[in-house]
Structures are given as C-alpha cells and as structure tokens.
C-alpha cells in the first residue's frame, strides 16, 4: 500500500516552532535536545528543526512532509523515521554523516536514483523502504530487481526491510528468499494444477461425544457410603467397650462425678 492519500494542505498543516520542540522534548534549549518524537502531528514543514544540532534520534512518521531540507544540519543524527509521509527524495540526508538507521517506508520514492544520496553514508546499516505489517511501501519496491539494486547501491547495509542481508543470519534470509522464488507460480510455465485442499479429519470428528454412563461413579459412591457407615458402627462399639471397662474398673460406690477427664 502506498502512503495515505490526501492529507491536510499546507495552509492547514502544522509547522515546527521552537515552542513545539521545547514542549515535546522538555528541554529549554534546542541544542540540548537528543531525542524527539513528532509522529502523527500533521506536519507540513520542519521549520527550525535544523537548529537541534545535538539531535540523535528523530521520529517524523505519519505526517505530510514533502521535503527534509532542515535535516541537512543534523550531523549527529543516528536514527530517523520518516515513514508514511509524501517524500519524493531524500537528498538532505546525504549530510547526516552519522546516520545508521533509516525508515522511509510509505513515501513516494520512485526508483533507485532517489537513494543515490545515501551511498556516501558509510555508517548506514539499517534501511526500511517497505513495511508489510503496516502496509507501507514505495513505488520503487514494486520493481522485480528492487532488492538487488538497493544491495548494489548500498553494499554496507546489514538489514533491509527487516531482513538481514549481511553478517550473521543473512544466509537464512537468503534461503527463505530462494524458497519463495522457487515456490512462486510462473503463469507462463506449464504444469499440473494444484490439488484441491482436503480436510484433515473425518466429518463429525470435532462433534461432542454423548455422555458416558455413570455406573462406575455410582458404584464408587455406594462403596464409600458403606465404608463410612462401618466406621460409624465401629466408633459406637468402641465407645460402648470403653464405658464398660470404666464401670468395671471403678471402685464400689463410686459415682460418675468422681472421675475427672
């Protein structure tokens, strides 16, 4: 899915001001801001954002931005999220020499030429141009050679669209891509039609079974009641025997009051 359609026009949009930046960050000076989250504010311009010279982490996703000019002065910026905007180019990011992670999914980047500006960023290791879970993409992602062209343009990437392309674990992702390619049907290739899916179990397998007879439980209860009655009888007999023994051992003329228990 491409980025959202018509957003509010620039006349109705929000622009970045010093007051907005200080309120969102809690800092008193723009140079002191290290982390800034401006997601989903309807921003149409970045205003004085370029004055935040110490900024290292920035989230501008879900706005209506068409250009990133002020970001060219952010030399300390390491993590940038500009997903779900209206960007057709990323040229100002060429000056962000410390950029390591970039999310630009859900914009209007038409081809690899729009990524050429990132080729000089030696520290860029993570790039996202499409996000299937969020249904965000770019026009260039529809090209059959998208993956290969990005890899060729940015050989230093370790993770592309959430998949590791180099380093530990990259072989696994490559194997998954190869399997997907081999299993993808070719419309022009002849071959047998796939078999119709069949149920795994017989009809009625999941239906509730009729209740079983409770004769075993009833017999167990009856035996328990009989045993309990025998215990009561034995208890009564024991008390009778004890009373007889006490009477036999008591001296002549002694009364019940003479026994202390």
UniProtKB/Swiss-Prot annotation:
Keywords: Leucine-rich repeat, Repeat. Transmembrane segments: none annotated. LRR repeats lie at residues 54-75, 76-97, 98-119. One of its GO terms (biological process) is outer dynein arm assembly. One of its GO terms (cellular component) is cytoplasm. Residues 138-183 form the LRRCT domain. It comes from the Eukaryota. Pfam families: LRR_1. This is Leucine-rich repeat-containing protein 61. The lineage of its organism: Eukaryota, Metazoa, Chordata, Craniata, Vertebrata.
């Amino acid at each position: 899915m491409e980025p959202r359609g018509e957003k509010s026009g620039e006349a109705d949009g929000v622009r970045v001001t010093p007051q907005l930046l200080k309120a969102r960050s809690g800092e008193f000076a723009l140079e002191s801001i290290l982390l800034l989250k401006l997601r989903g504010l309807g921003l149409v311009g970045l205003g004085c954002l370029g004055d935040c010279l110490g900024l290292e982490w920035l989230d501008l996703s879900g706005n209506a931005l068409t250009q990133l000019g002020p970001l060219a002065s952010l030399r300390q910026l390491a993590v940038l999220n500009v997903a779900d905007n209206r960007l057709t180019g990323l040229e100002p990011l060429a000056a962000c020499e410390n950029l390591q992670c970039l999310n630009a999914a859900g914009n209007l980047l038409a081809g690899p030429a729009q990524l050429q500006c990132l080729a000089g960023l030696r520290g860029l290791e993570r790039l996202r141009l499409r996000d299937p879970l969020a249904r965000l993409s770019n026009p260039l992602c529809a090209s059959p050679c998208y993956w290969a062209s990005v890899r060729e343009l940015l050989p230093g990437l370790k993770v592309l669209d959430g998949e590791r392309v180099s380093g530990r674990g990259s072989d696994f992702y490559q194997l998954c891509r190869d399997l997907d390619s081999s299993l993808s049907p070719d419309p022009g290739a002849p071959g047998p039609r796939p078999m119709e899916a069949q149920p795994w179990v017989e009809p009625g397998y999941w239906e509730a079974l009729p209740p079983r007879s409770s004769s075993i439980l009833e017999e167990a209860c009856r035996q328990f009641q009989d045993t309990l009655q025998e215990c009561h009888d034995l208890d009564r007999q024991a008390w009778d025997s004890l009373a007889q023994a006490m009477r036999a051992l008591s001296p002549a003329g002694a009364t019940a009051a003479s026994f202390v228990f």
